[in-house]
């Protein structure tokens, strides 16, 4: 099923990239939590945010978003076909157990621990086993560093963490994403608008 879902999503994204409107594209098959494959080329996608510092968890995170989702403006919801991938790195530690930092105070990335993916498709939220944890039409996947082997993480925990941010389309760091785009001069949204 994972392969079928990946092929259906890829076909939809190719059609959108080729200029077909999303309305004219056949919708991708419904995907359940744990079935959404990590696209092989995701590190070539626009960066959502990089070097997200999580000293509380001893982690550094890089987040990517596919071109379908990267063009929205502030206050807009991500369209169906959006996929976001998060690389979760262990922060390096000094011999005394403290977290290693760069001269500018940022945590230093160590080994890649896991890869998480979230994708949005029409009706995908209807597949959620616990309706009280529905995050719109988003589904989630959690994989080991190879981005193929399921990590065994409880997807309900992902859903529970994203649930309180419905006003941001269930996407953490939504506002930070737009602030970063404006600050770096990358704020070119559909229709040419800026926040």
Annotate each language-model stretch with its function:
Residues 23-32, 36-50, 57, 75, ...:
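Sequence context surrounding c-type heme c attachment/ligation sites in exported
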Residues 5-6, 62-64, 165-168:
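Intrinsic structural disorder/low-complexity segments
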Residues 1, 21-23:
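Short, low-complexity disordered leader/linker segments with a strong preference
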Residues 47-71:
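His/Cys-centered metal/cofactor-coordination and adjacent catalytic loops
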Residues 9-10, 176:
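Extended rod-forming repeat segments used as scaffolds/tethers
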Residues 1-9:
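Bacterial N-terminal signal peptides that target proteins for export
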Residues 16-19:
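C-terminal motif of bacterial Sec signal peptides marking the signal peptidase cleavage site
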């Amino acid at each position: 099923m994972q392969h079928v879902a990946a092929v259906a999503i890829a076909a939809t994204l190719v059609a959108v990239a080729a200029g077909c409107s999303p309305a004219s594209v056949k919708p991708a098959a419904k995907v359940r939590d744990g079935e959404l494959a990590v696209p092989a080329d995701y590190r070539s996608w626009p960066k959502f945010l990089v070097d997200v510092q999580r000293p509380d968890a001893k982690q550094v995170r890089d987040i990517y978003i596919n071109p379908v989702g990267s063009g929205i403006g502030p206050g807009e919801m991500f369209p169906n076909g959006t996929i976001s991938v998060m690389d979760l790195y262990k922060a390096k530690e000094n011999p005394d157990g403290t977290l290693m930092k760069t001269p500018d105070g940022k945590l230093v990335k160590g080994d890649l621990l896991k890869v998480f993916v979230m994708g949005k498709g029409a009706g995908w939220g209807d597949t959620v086993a616990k309706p009280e944890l529905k995050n719109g039409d988003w589904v989630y996947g959690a994989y080991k560093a190879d981005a193929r082997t399921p990590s065994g993480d409880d997807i309900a925990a992902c859903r529970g963490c994203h649930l309180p941010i419905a006003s941001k389309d269930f996407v953490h760091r939504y506002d930070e994403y737009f602030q970063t785009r404006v600050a770096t001069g990358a704020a070119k949204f559909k229709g040419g608008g800026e926040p």
